[in-house]
Amino acid sequence: MTSKDLKGTKIDNIDMEKNFPKLNLFTMFRLGFYQMGLGTMSVLTLGVLNRVMIAELKIPATIVAITLSLYQFMAPARVWFGQMSDTKPLLGKHRTGYMWIGAVFFTVTAFFAVQAMWQVGDSLRVNGWSNSTYFWIGILGLMFIFYGLALSASSTPFAALLVDISDEDNRSKVVGIVWSMLMVGIIIGAITSSFLLKQVGVDAPLETVQVSINNLFIIIPAIVLVFAFIGTVGIEEKYSRYGSRSTIANREDQVTMGTTLKILKANRQTGLFFTFVFVLIISLFMQDAVLEPYAGEIFLMPISESTRLNAVSGIGTLIGLGTTGFLVVPRLGKKNSLKVGCVATTISFILIVMSGFTGKLSLFLSALFLYGLAAGLTTTAALSLMLDLTAAETAGTFIGAWGLAQAMARGLSTVIGGVTLDVGRRLFNVSMLAYGLVFLLAGVGMILSIFLLNRVNVREFQDNASVAIATILEGELD
Protein backbone atom coordinates (compact mmCIF):
# COMPACT_ATOMS: atom_id res chain seq x y z
CA MET A 1 0.00 0.00 0.00
CA THR A 2 1.49 3.34 -1.06
CA SER A 3 0.97 6.78 0.43
CA LYS A 4 -1.07 7.58 -2.68
CA ASP A 5 -3.33 4.60 -1.90
CA LEU A 6 -3.74 5.80 1.66
CA LYS A 7 -4.77 9.25 0.52
CA GLY A 8 -7.15 7.77 -2.02
CA THR A 9 -8.76 5.62 0.63
CA LYS A 10 -9.38 8.68 2.78
CA ILE A 11 -11.07 10.47 -0.11
CA ASP A 12 -13.27 7.43 -0.77
CA ASN A 13 -14.29 7.39 2.88
CA ILE A 14 -15.58 10.96 2.92
CA ASP A 15 -18.91 9.87 1.47
CA MET A 16 -19.15 7.08 4.07
CA GLU A 17 -18.91 9.62 6.89
CA LYS A 18 -21.96 11.44 5.58
CA ASN A 19 -24.04 8.40 6.49
CA PHE A 20 -23.25 8.71 10.22
CA PRO A 21 -25.72 10.70 12.36
CA LYS A 22 -24.54 13.84 14.14
CA LEU A 23 -24.22 13.81 17.91
CA ASN A 24 -27.08 15.57 19.66
CA LEU A 25 -26.86 17.31 23.03
CA PHE A 26 -28.55 14.41 24.83
CA THR A 27 -25.88 11.99 23.58
CA MET A 28 -23.10 14.39 24.53
CA PHE A 29 -24.43 14.61 28.07
CA ARG A 30 -24.88 10.83 28.17
CA LEU A 31 -21.22 10.41 27.25
CA GLY A 32 -20.45 12.72 30.14
CA PHE A 33 -21.73 10.10 32.60
CA TYR A 34 -18.55 8.12 31.98
CA GLN A 35 -16.37 11.13 32.79
CA MET A 36 -18.58 11.94 35.76
CA GLY A 37 -17.73 8.53 37.17
CA LEU A 38 -14.00 9.14 36.72
CA GLY A 39 -14.31 12.46 38.52
CA THR A 40 -16.05 10.80 41.45
CA MET A 41 -13.34 8.13 41.68
CA SER A 42 -10.62 10.79 41.72
CA VAL A 43 -12.14 12.26 44.88
CA LEU A 44 -11.94 8.88 46.59
CA THR A 45 -8.26 8.36 45.79
CA LEU A 46 -6.78 11.83 46.23
CA GLY A 47 -9.49 13.50 48.29
CA VAL A 48 -10.11 10.77 50.87
CA LEU A 49 -7.36 8.15 50.98
CA ASN A 50 -4.47 10.62 51.20
CA ARG A 51 -6.16 12.37 54.13
CA VAL A 52 -6.84 9.10 55.95
CA MET A 53 -3.33 7.73 55.45
CA ILE A 54 -1.54 10.93 56.48
CA ALA A 55 -3.79 12.27 59.23
CA GLU A 56 -5.51 9.18 60.69
CA LEU A 57 -3.03 6.35 60.04
CA LYS A 58 0.07 8.56 60.52
CA ILE A 59 1.84 7.24 57.43
CA PRO A 60 4.62 9.62 56.23
CA ALA A 61 3.50 11.90 53.41
CA THR A 62 6.30 10.75 51.10
CA ILE A 63 5.23 7.10 51.32
CA VAL A 64 1.58 8.07 50.87
CA ALA A 65 2.40 10.22 47.84
CA ILE A 66 4.52 7.53 46.19
CA THR A 67 1.92 4.83 46.84
CA LEU A 68 -1.01 6.88 45.58
CA SER A 69 0.93 7.97 42.52
CA LEU A 70 1.76 4.44 41.37
CA TYR A 71 -1.47 4.19 39.40
CA GLN A 72 -0.42 7.28 37.45
CA PHE A 73 2.96 5.74 36.66
CA MET A 74 1.19 2.98 34.77
CA ALA A 75 0.61 5.65 32.14
CA PRO A 76 2.97 4.12 29.53
CA ALA A 77 0.27 1.47 29.15
CA ARG A 78 -2.00 4.20 27.79
CA VAL A 79 -0.06 4.29 24.53
CA TRP A 80 -0.33 0.50 24.29
CA PHE A 81 -4.05 0.44 25.09
CA GLY A 82 -4.61 3.28 22.64
CA GLN A 83 -2.76 1.41 19.91
CA MET A 84 -4.60 -1.82 20.77
CA SER A 85 -7.97 -0.09 20.52
CA ASP A 86 -6.89 1.33 17.15
CA THR A 87 -6.00 -2.08 15.75
CA LYS A 88 -7.52 -4.94 17.80
CA PRO A 89 -11.28 -4.82 18.52
CA LEU A 90 -12.39 -6.27 21.87
CA LEU A 91 -15.90 -7.70 22.26
CA GLY A 92 -16.42 -6.71 18.63
CA LYS A 93 -15.71 -2.99 19.15
CA HIS A 94 -12.57 -0.86 18.87
CA ARG A 95 -13.26 1.24 21.97
CA THR A 96 -16.26 0.03 24.00
CA GLY A 97 -14.94 -3.39 25.02
CA TYR A 98 -11.78 -1.89 26.51
CA MET A 99 -13.79 0.79 28.30
CA TRP A 100 -16.21 -1.63 29.95
CA ILE A 101 -13.73 -4.29 31.03
CA GLY A 102 -11.37 -1.62 32.35
CA ALA A 103 -14.20 0.00 34.33
CA VAL A 104 -15.07 -3.29 36.03
CA PHE A 105 -11.48 -3.81 37.10
CA PHE A 106 -10.70 -0.28 38.36
CA THR A 107 -13.88 -0.07 40.46
CA VAL A 108 -13.29 -3.47 42.08
CA THR A 109 -9.58 -2.84 42.63
CA ALA A 110 -10.31 0.42 44.47
CA PHE A 111 -12.09 -1.48 47.25
CA PHE A 112 -9.24 -3.97 47.66
CA ALA A 113 -6.77 -1.07 47.84
CA VAL A 114 -8.66 0.30 50.84
CA GLN A 115 -8.43 -3.07 52.61
CA ALA A 116 -4.67 -3.10 52.03
CA MET A 117 -4.49 0.44 53.44
CA TRP A 118 -6.06 -0.68 56.73
CA GLN A 119 -3.51 -3.49 56.97
CA VAL A 120 -0.68 -0.99 56.55
CA GLY A 121 -2.12 1.16 59.33
CA ASP A 122 -2.63 -1.80 61.68
CA SER A 123 0.86 -3.16 61.09
CA LEU A 124 2.46 0.25 61.56
CA ARG A 125 0.58 0.82 64.81
CA VAL A 126 1.31 -2.63 66.25
CA ASN A 127 4.70 -3.55 64.78
CA GLY A 128 6.21 -0.23 63.71
CA TRP A 129 8.42 -0.28 60.62
CA SER A 130 8.68 -4.06 60.45
CA ASN A 131 8.82 -6.50 57.55
CA SER A 132 5.08 -6.94 57.93
CA THR A 133 4.52 -3.22 57.43
CA TYR A 134 6.72 -3.12 54.35
CA PHE A 135 4.91 -6.17 52.99
CA TRP A 136 1.51 -4.50 53.26
CA ILE A 137 2.87 -1.29 51.76
CA GLY A 138 3.99 -3.42 48.82
CA ILE A 139 0.52 -4.97 48.52
CA LEU A 140 -1.06 -1.52 48.66
CA GLY A 141 1.29 -0.34 45.93
CA LEU A 142 0.41 -3.40 43.84
CA MET A 143 -3.29 -2.59 44.16
CA PHE A 144 -2.69 0.91 42.82
CA ILE A 145 -0.63 -0.52 39.95
CA PHE A 146 -3.58 -2.74 38.97
CA TYR A 147 -5.89 0.25 39.40
CA GLY A 148 -3.74 2.32 37.05
CA LEU A 149 -3.63 -0.37 34.38
CA ALA A 150 -7.41 -0.80 34.48
CA LEU A 151 -7.94 2.96 34.37
CA SER A 152 -5.63 3.26 31.36
CA ALA A 153 -7.43 0.42 29.56
CA SER A 154 -10.75 2.17 30.05
CA SER A 155 -10.11 5.92 29.82
CA THR A 156 -7.73 6.01 26.83
CA PRO A 157 -10.17 4.29 24.41
CA PHE A 158 -12.91 6.58 25.75
CA ALA A 159 -10.93 9.69 24.82
CA ALA A 160 -10.18 8.17 21.41
CA LEU A 161 -13.90 7.47 21.01
CA LEU A 162 -14.59 11.19 21.39
CA VAL A 163 -12.37 11.82 18.37
CA ASP A 164 -14.02 8.97 16.44
CA ILE A 165 -17.59 10.16 16.92
CA SER A 166 -17.09 13.91 16.47
CA ASP A 167 -16.31 16.28 13.63
CA GLU A 168 -14.42 19.56 13.58
CA ASP A 169 -17.61 21.60 13.84
CA ASN A 170 -18.89 19.92 17.03
CA ARG A 171 -15.75 18.57 18.70
CA SER A 172 -15.30 21.57 21.00
CA LYS A 173 -18.90 21.15 22.20
CA VAL A 174 -18.30 17.48 22.96
CA VAL A 175 -15.13 18.28 24.90
CA GLY A 176 -16.75 21.12 26.83
CA ILE A 177 -19.79 19.07 27.87
CA VAL A 178 -17.92 15.85 28.66
CA TRP A 179 -15.22 17.54 30.73
CA SER A 180 -17.81 19.67 32.49
CA MET A 181 -19.44 16.41 33.52
CA LEU A 182 -16.06 15.31 34.88
CA MET A 183 -16.18 18.27 37.23
CA VAL A 184 -19.79 17.48 38.10
CA GLY A 185 -18.53 14.05 39.11
CA ILE A 186 -15.85 15.59 41.31
CA ILE A 187 -18.42 17.82 42.97
CA ILE A 188 -20.86 14.94 43.44
CA GLY A 189 -18.07 12.75 44.77
CA ALA A 190 -17.00 15.42 47.25
CA ILE A 191 -20.54 16.08 48.48
CA THR A 192 -21.47 12.39 48.64
CA SER A 193 -18.24 11.51 50.42
CA SER A 194 -18.82 14.31 52.90
CA PHE A 195 -22.37 13.05 53.57
CA LEU A 196 -21.31 9.43 54.02
CA LEU A 197 -18.44 10.50 56.29
CA LYS A 198 -20.34 13.13 58.28
CA GLN A 199 -20.23 11.06 61.47
CA VAL A 200 -16.43 10.93 61.27
CA GLY A 201 -15.09 13.85 63.33
CA VAL A 202 -11.52 15.04 63.81
CA ASP A 203 -10.96 12.71 66.78
CA ALA A 204 -13.26 9.87 65.70
CA PRO A 205 -12.14 6.33 66.68
CA LEU A 206 -10.31 4.49 63.93
CA GLU A 207 -12.98 1.78 63.92
CA THR A 208 -15.62 4.38 63.03
CA VAL A 209 -13.42 5.77 60.27
CA GLN A 210 -12.81 2.28 58.90
CA VAL A 211 -16.50 1.35 58.67
CA SER A 212 -17.41 4.63 56.99
CA ILE A 213 -14.57 4.47 54.45
CA ASN A 214 -15.37 0.85 53.57
CA ASN A 215 -19.02 1.72 52.93
CA LEU A 216 -17.93 4.68 50.82
CA PHE A 217 -15.73 2.46 48.65
CA ILE A 218 -18.58 0.00 48.09
CA ILE A 219 -21.31 2.49 47.22
CA ILE A 220 -19.41 4.98 45.05
CA PRO A 221 -17.54 2.50 42.78
CA ALA A 222 -20.80 0.61 42.16
CA ILE A 223 -22.45 3.85 41.02
CA VAL A 224 -19.42 4.70 38.87
CA LEU A 225 -19.63 1.33 37.11
CA VAL A 226 -23.30 1.93 36.30
CA PHE A 227 -22.42 5.38 34.95
CA ALA A 228 -19.76 3.86 32.68
CA PHE A 229 -22.27 1.52 31.07
CA ILE A 230 -25.09 4.07 30.80
CA GLY A 231 -22.80 6.66 29.26
CA THR A 232 -21.34 4.52 26.50
CA VAL A 233 -23.70 1.70 25.53
CA GLY A 234 -24.56 1.84 21.83
CA ILE A 235 -22.50 4.97 21.13
CA GLU A 236 -19.69 3.39 19.12
CA GLU A 237 -22.01 1.33 16.93
CA LYS A 238 -24.11 4.34 15.97
CA TYR A 239 -21.68 7.25 15.77
CA SER A 240 -18.07 6.08 15.31
CA ARG A 241 -16.37 7.18 12.09
CA TYR A 242 -13.13 5.40 12.94
CA GLY A 243 -13.56 2.60 10.42
CA SER A 244 -14.07 5.10 7.60
CA ARG A 245 -11.30 7.44 8.69
CA SER A 246 -8.50 4.98 9.37
CA THR A 247 -6.74 2.70 6.92
CA ILE A 248 -5.30 0.62 9.78
CA ALA A 249 -8.55 -0.13 11.61
CA ASN A 250 -8.76 -3.65 10.19
CA ARG A 251 -5.05 -4.40 9.78
CA GLU A 252 -4.31 -5.51 13.35
CA ASP A 253 -1.96 -8.24 12.17
CA GLN A 254 0.42 -5.74 10.61
CA VAL A 255 0.38 -2.56 12.70
CA THR A 256 2.78 -3.09 15.59
CA MET A 257 3.78 -1.11 18.65
CA GLY A 258 6.99 -0.25 16.82
CA THR A 259 4.97 1.37 14.05
CA THR A 260 3.02 3.29 16.66
CA LEU A 261 6.19 4.68 18.25
CA LYS A 262 7.55 5.69 14.84
CA ILE A 263 4.36 7.63 14.16
CA LEU A 264 4.69 9.45 17.47
CA LYS A 265 8.35 10.32 16.91
CA ALA A 266 7.90 11.43 13.30
CA ASN A 267 6.69 14.91 14.23
CA ARG A 268 8.85 17.33 16.24
CA GLN A 269 5.79 19.04 17.67
CA THR A 270 4.68 15.80 19.34
CA GLY A 271 7.65 15.94 21.70
CA LEU A 272 7.28 19.66 22.33
CA PHE A 273 3.60 19.36 23.23
CA PHE A 274 4.29 16.28 25.35
CA THR A 275 6.83 18.28 27.39
CA PHE A 276 4.46 21.21 27.79
CA VAL A 277 1.61 18.98 28.99
CA PHE A 278 3.98 17.20 31.38
CA VAL A 279 5.16 20.40 33.10
CA LEU A 280 1.70 21.99 33.08
CA ILE A 281 0.00 19.02 34.76
CA ILE A 282 2.72 18.63 37.38
CA SER A 283 2.37 22.28 38.35
CA LEU A 284 -1.42 22.34 38.21
CA PHE A 285 -1.95 19.30 40.42
CA MET A 286 1.02 19.32 42.79
CA GLN A 287 -1.30 20.64 45.49
CA ASP A 288 -3.56 17.57 45.27
CA ALA A 289 -1.36 15.57 47.63
CA VAL A 290 -1.31 18.23 50.36
CA LEU A 291 -4.52 20.27 50.12
CA GLU A 292 -6.70 18.22 52.47
CA PRO A 293 -3.90 17.71 55.03
CA TYR A 294 -3.21 21.47 54.76
CA ALA A 295 -6.84 22.22 55.58
CA GLY A 296 -6.82 19.76 58.45
CA GLU A 297 -3.55 20.96 59.98
CA ILE A 298 -3.72 24.71 59.37
CA PHE A 299 -7.50 25.30 59.56
CA LEU A 300 -8.34 22.28 61.80
CA MET A 301 -10.97 20.91 59.41
CA PRO A 302 -12.40 17.41 60.06
CA ILE A 303 -12.40 14.86 57.20
CA SER A 304 -15.99 15.63 56.22
CA GLU A 305 -15.20 19.34 55.76
CA SER A 306 -11.81 18.96 54.07
CA THR A 307 -13.35 16.54 51.56
CA ARG A 308 -15.82 19.28 50.56
CA LEU A 309 -12.91 21.43 49.39
CA ASN A 310 -13.07 19.48 46.14
CA ALA A 311 -16.56 20.86 45.66
CA VAL A 312 -15.36 24.46 46.10
CA SER A 313 -12.63 24.20 43.49
CA GLY A 314 -14.80 21.88 41.40
CA ILE A 315 -17.58 24.47 41.09
CA GLY A 316 -15.00 27.01 39.94
CA THR A 317 -13.60 24.55 37.42
CA LEU A 318 -17.08 23.70 36.17
CA ILE A 319 -17.80 27.39 35.56
CA GLY A 320 -14.43 27.75 33.86
CA LEU A 321 -15.05 24.75 31.62
CA GLY A 322 -18.57 25.82 30.77
CA THR A 323 -17.76 29.42 29.84
CA THR A 324 -14.20 29.44 28.52
CA GLY A 325 -15.02 27.76 25.22
CA PHE A 326 -17.66 30.39 24.48
CA LEU A 327 -16.21 33.56 26.03
CA VAL A 328 -12.43 33.34 26.32
CA VAL A 329 -10.93 30.99 23.72
CA PRO A 330 -12.86 32.51 20.75
CA ARG A 331 -11.51 35.95 21.68
CA LEU A 332 -7.98 35.20 22.85
CA GLY A 333 -7.20 31.95 21.05
CA LYS A 334 -6.11 28.67 22.60
CA LYS A 335 -2.50 29.56 23.41
CA ASN A 336 -3.24 32.99 24.88
CA SER A 337 -6.07 31.49 26.92
CA LEU A 338 -3.64 28.94 28.29
CA LYS A 339 -1.24 31.71 29.30
CA VAL A 340 -4.00 33.57 31.14
CA GLY A 341 -4.93 30.33 32.91
CA CYS A 342 -1.35 29.73 34.02
CA VAL A 343 -1.04 33.25 35.48
CA ALA A 344 -4.40 32.99 37.25
CA THR A 345 -3.42 29.63 38.74
CA THR A 346 -0.19 31.10 40.08
CA ILE A 347 -2.14 33.93 41.73
CA SER A 348 -4.46 31.39 43.37
CA PHE A 349 -1.48 29.55 44.86
CA ILE A 350 -0.16 32.81 46.31
CA LEU A 351 -3.56 33.52 47.88
CA ILE A 352 -3.73 30.01 49.37
CA VAL A 353 -0.41 30.62 51.13
CA MET A 354 -1.54 34.06 52.33
CA SER A 355 -4.71 32.52 53.78
CA GLY A 356 -2.63 30.12 55.84
CA PHE A 357 -0.40 32.85 57.25
CA THR A 358 -3.36 35.07 58.10
CA GLY A 359 -5.64 32.25 59.24
CA LYS A 360 -8.51 33.58 57.11
CA LEU A 361 -10.67 30.66 56.02
CA SER A 362 -12.71 32.89 53.71
CA LEU A 363 -9.56 33.84 51.78
CA PHE A 364 -8.61 30.16 51.55
CA LEU A 365 -11.99 29.20 50.09
CA SER A 366 -11.93 32.15 47.69
CA ALA A 367 -8.46 31.16 46.52
CA LEU A 368 -9.66 27.60 45.93
CA PHE A 369 -12.55 28.91 43.85
CA LEU A 370 -10.14 31.03 41.80
CA TYR A 371 -7.93 27.98 41.36
CA GLY A 372 -10.95 26.11 40.01
CA LEU A 373 -11.78 28.87 37.54
CA ALA A 374 -8.17 29.01 36.36
CA ALA A 375 -8.00 25.22 36.08
CA GLY A 376 -11.19 25.21 33.99
CA LEU A 377 -9.78 27.84 31.66
CA THR A 378 -6.47 26.01 31.36
CA THR A 379 -8.13 22.63 30.82
CA THR A 380 -10.49 23.84 28.09
CA ALA A 381 -7.74 25.57 26.15
CA ALA A 382 -5.31 22.67 26.58
CA LEU A 383 -7.86 20.05 25.48
CA SER A 384 -8.78 22.09 22.41
CA LEU A 385 -5.10 22.41 21.55
CA MET A 386 -4.65 18.67 22.15
CA LEU A 387 -7.36 17.80 19.64
CA ASP A 388 -5.65 20.05 17.10
CA LEU A 389 -2.56 17.91 17.71
CA THR A 390 -4.33 14.55 17.27
CA ALA A 391 -4.39 12.79 13.90
CA ALA A 392 -7.73 11.05 13.26
CA GLU A 393 -5.87 8.33 11.32
CA THR A 394 -4.37 7.03 14.59
CA ALA A 395 -6.55 8.70 17.21
CA GLY A 396 -5.97 6.11 19.93
CA THR A 397 -2.21 6.32 19.51
CA PHE A 398 -2.04 10.10 19.92
CA ILE A 399 -4.63 10.15 22.71
CA GLY A 400 -2.52 7.51 24.42
CA ALA A 401 0.56 9.71 24.11
CA TRP A 402 -1.17 12.75 25.55
CA GLY A 403 -2.70 10.53 28.23
CA LEU A 404 0.79 9.25 29.01
CA ALA A 405 2.08 12.78 29.52
CA GLN A 406 -0.94 13.70 31.63
CA ALA A 407 -0.96 10.60 33.82
CA MET A 408 2.79 10.45 34.37
CA ALA A 409 2.73 14.12 35.29
CA ARG A 410 -0.19 13.57 37.68
CA GLY A 411 1.69 10.77 39.36
CA LEU A 412 4.89 12.77 39.59
CA SER A 413 2.99 15.81 40.85
CA THR A 414 1.67 13.74 43.75
CA VAL A 415 5.17 12.54 44.60
CA ILE A 416 6.70 16.01 44.26
CA GLY A 417 3.97 17.48 46.44
CA GLY A 418 4.45 14.90 49.20
CA VAL A 419 8.25 14.96 49.08
CA THR A 420 8.34 18.77 49.03
CA LEU A 421 6.10 18.83 52.11
CA ASP A 422 8.42 16.47 53.99
CA VAL A 423 11.50 18.43 52.87
CA GLY A 424 9.80 21.64 53.98
CA ARG A 425 9.10 20.17 57.41
CA ARG A 426 12.78 19.31 57.82
CA LEU A 427 13.99 22.68 56.56
CA PHE A 428 11.63 24.94 58.48
CA ASN A 429 10.12 22.82 61.27
CA VAL A 430 7.02 25.01 60.80
CA SER A 431 4.02 23.45 59.08
CA MET A 432 2.86 26.62 57.34
CA LEU A 433 6.27 27.20 55.75
CA ALA A 434 6.44 23.57 54.64
CA TYR A 435 3.05 23.76 52.94
CA GLY A 436 3.92 27.15 51.49
CA LEU A 437 6.97 25.63 49.79
CA VAL A 438 4.69 23.22 47.89
CA PHE A 439 2.44 25.99 46.57
CA LEU A 440 5.43 28.19 45.70
CA LEU A 441 7.03 25.43 43.64
CA ALA A 442 3.73 24.83 41.83
CA GLY A 443 3.50 28.52 40.92
CA VAL A 444 7.01 28.53 39.49
CA GLY A 445 6.06 25.53 37.35
CA MET A 446 3.03 27.33 35.93
CA ILE A 447 5.25 30.21 34.77
CA LEU A 448 7.67 27.72 33.20
CA SER A 449 4.72 26.22 31.30
CA ILE A 450 4.14 29.54 29.55
CA PHE A 451 7.68 29.54 28.15
CA LEU A 452 7.27 25.95 26.91
CA LEU A 453 3.93 26.79 25.31
CA ASN A 454 5.56 29.42 23.12
CA ARG A 455 7.41 26.64 21.26
CA VAL A 456 4.26 24.67 20.35
CA ASN A 457 3.16 25.20 16.72
CA VAL A 458 -0.13 23.62 15.65
CA ARG A 459 0.28 24.45 11.97
CA GLU A 460 3.66 22.72 11.83
CA PHE A 461 2.13 19.59 13.37
CA GLN A 462 -0.81 19.53 10.98
CA ASP A 463 1.39 20.12 7.93
CA ASN A 464 3.71 17.24 8.82
CA ALA A 465 1.39 14.68 10.47
CA SER A 466 -0.49 13.32 7.45
CA VAL A 467 2.63 12.96 5.32
CA ALA A 468 4.57 11.31 8.15
CA ILE A 469 1.82 8.79 8.94
CA ALA A 470 1.32 7.89 5.28
CA THR A 471 5.06 7.42 4.74
CA ILE A 472 5.50 5.22 7.82
CA LEU A 473 2.47 3.08 7.04
CA GLU A 474 3.65 2.68 3.47
CA GLY A 475 6.88 1.14 4.74
CA GLU A 476 5.40 -0.87 7.61
CA LEU A 477 2.20 -2.26 6.09
CA ASP A 478 3.51 -3.45 2.73
Segments predicted by a language model, with ranges:
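Short amphipathic helix-loop junctions that connect adjacent transmembrane helices
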Residues: G47-I63, A289-S306
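Intracellular juxtamembrane helix-capping segments at the cytosolic ends
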Residues: A153-S166, L377-A391
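Helix-to-loop junctions at the C-terminal end of transmembrane segments
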Residues: P76-G92, G320-N336, L421
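Loop-to-transmembrane helix entry/capping segments in MFS-fold secondary transporters
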Residues: A61-T62, I137, E168-I177, I303-S304, ...
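Cytoplasmic membrane-interface "Motif A"-like loop-to-helix N-cap segments
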Residues: T87-F105, V329-V343, V430
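Intracellular loop-helix junctions on the cytosolic face of multi-pass helical membrane proteins
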Residues: M1-F26, S130-I145, L149, A153-A159, ...
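C-terminal ends and interior cores of transmembrane alpha-helices
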Residues: W100-T133, V343-G359
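C-terminal transmembrane helical hairpin of 12-TM major facilitator-type secondary transporters
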Residues: L338-A381
